[in-house]
């Protein structure tokens, strides 16, 4: 297999992996209300896909997953979002850890 063909195949595999991660994320959002354990499983599958293909999870998905216990975070249910000193502070209610994401203040 030539170098170009391998590169095209890798790009195709990564595109499929990203599609699957987004689909699992949408399923996790919709299933959380009735089956929170299913949404935890979907998060686990997202992580497995990203590790298997050695690619990062998209930022929008990554911000909704606890970095410590890998719980699916839903604002108001199992996560608390606060704005503090230029950061969004997300507190996981399951493990008690906090994640901080910077944001730009409007001038």
From Swiss-Prot:
<keyword id="KW-0255">Endonuclease</keyword>
<keyword id="KW-0540">Nuclease</keyword>
<dbReference type="InterPro" id="IPR016432">
    <property type="entry name" value="RNP4"/>
</dbReference>
<dbReference type="GO" id="GO:0030677">
    <property type="term" value="C:ribonuclease P complex"/>
</dbReference>
<dbReference type="InterPro" id="IPR007175">
    <property type="entry name" value="Rpr2/Snm1/Rpp21"/>
</dbReference>
<dbReference type="GO" id="GO:0005737">
    <property type="term" value="C:cytoplasm"/>
</dbReference>
<dbReference type="GO" id="GO:0008270">
    <property type="term" value="F:zinc ion binding"/>
</dbReference>
<comment type="similarity">
    <text>Belongs to the eukaryotic/archaeal RNase P protein component 4 family.</text>
</comment>
<keyword id="KW-0819">tRNA processing</keyword>
<keyword id="KW-0862">Zinc</keyword>
<keyword id="KW-0963">Cytoplasm</keyword>
<dbReference type="Pfam" id="PF04032">
    <property type="entry name" value="Rpr2"/>
</dbReference>
<feature type="binding site">
    <location>
        <position position="69"/>
    </location>
    <ligand>
        <name>Zn(2+)</name>
    </ligand>
</feature>
<feature type="binding site">
    <location>
        <position position="66"/>
    </location>
    <ligand>
        <name>Zn(2+)</name>
    </ligand>
</feature>
<feature type="binding site">
    <location>
        <position position="92"/>
    </location>
    <ligand>
        <name>Zn(2+)</name>
    </ligand>
</feature>
<dbReference type="GO" id="GO:0001682">
    <property type="term" value="P:tRNA 5'-leader removal"/>
</dbReference>
<feature type="binding site">
    <location>
        <position position="95"/>
    </location>
    <ligand>
        <name>Zn(2+)</name>
    </ligand>
</feature>
<protein>
    <recommendedName>
        <fullName>Ribonuclease P protein component 4</fullName>
        <ecNumber>3.1.26.5</ecNumber>
    </recommendedName>
</protein>
<dbReference type="GO" id="GO:0004526">
    <property type="term" value="F:ribonuclease P activity"/>
</dbReference>
<comment type="subunit">
    <text>Consists of a catalytic RNA component and at least 4-5 protein subunits.</text>
</comment>
<keyword id="KW-0479">Metal-binding</keyword>
<comment type="function">
    <text>Part of ribonuclease P, a protein complex that generates mature tRNA molecules by cleaving their 5'-ends.</text>
</comment>
<keyword id="KW-0378">Hydrolase</keyword>
């Amino acid at each position: 297999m030539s170098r170009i063909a391998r590169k095209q195949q890798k790009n195709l595999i990564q595109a499929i992996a990203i599609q699957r991660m987004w689909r699992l994320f949408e399923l996790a959002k919709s299933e959380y209300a009735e089956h929170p354990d299913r949404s935890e499983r979907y998060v686990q599958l997202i992580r497995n896909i990203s590790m298997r293909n050695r690619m990062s999870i998209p930022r929008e998905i990554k911000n909704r997953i606890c970095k410590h216990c890998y719980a699916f975070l839903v604002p108001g249910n199992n996560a608390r979002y606060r704005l503090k000193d230029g950061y969004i502070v997300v507190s996981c209610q399951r493990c008690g850890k906090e994640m901080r994401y910077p944001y730009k203040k409007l001038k």
